[in-house]
């Protein structure tokens, strides 16, 4: 069951969403998929709210949704009801103002002008692509994925635009995640080729 936390309840928070968990259990839901939980980029933002797929920090919770403790409490309540929780993982790209843009600009795909570029075939000008030929980026992203399993207790990921990231990255990351606990990996991909 997909949850866009900021629109799921009037409050738009993990705390408010957790109140709805017994109802979802009664409906027969077994897995909850939280759309991106991370802070949303402000540079080149689409609309007033921005796209949750324009991630500003892979290791932070969007403060509009709550805190890490709130997320952890949501997951714990879901687990107590026999529900599993996966979060959306946006591994191909970031917001223009992602912390990595300042800390590691070399981790971004570059256009002919040497500047970071958005994915060319979509109207995704609010995000820029990462360059998975960089081993340090691969380590960072794997560690960030492990962080949410360890710190929030999530049960896996729904991976956005999975085909834009090399398969060997997903193979390696999945092995590392499953060394922590069994995780569920759901991937999304639409090829324009």
Predicted regions and their residues:
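Short catalytic-loop micro-motif centered on adjacent basic/acidic residues
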Residues: 86, 156-162
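Short, polar loop motifs at secondary-structure junctions
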Residues: 189-193
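Substrate-binding/catalytic cleft of secreted carbohydrate-active enzymes
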Residues: 161, 185-188
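Substrate-binding/active-site clefts of carbohydrate-active enzymes
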Residues: 6-15, 19-30, 36-152, 172-179, ...
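Glycan-recognition and catalytic cores of secretory/periplasmic carbohydrate-active enzymes
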Residues: 167
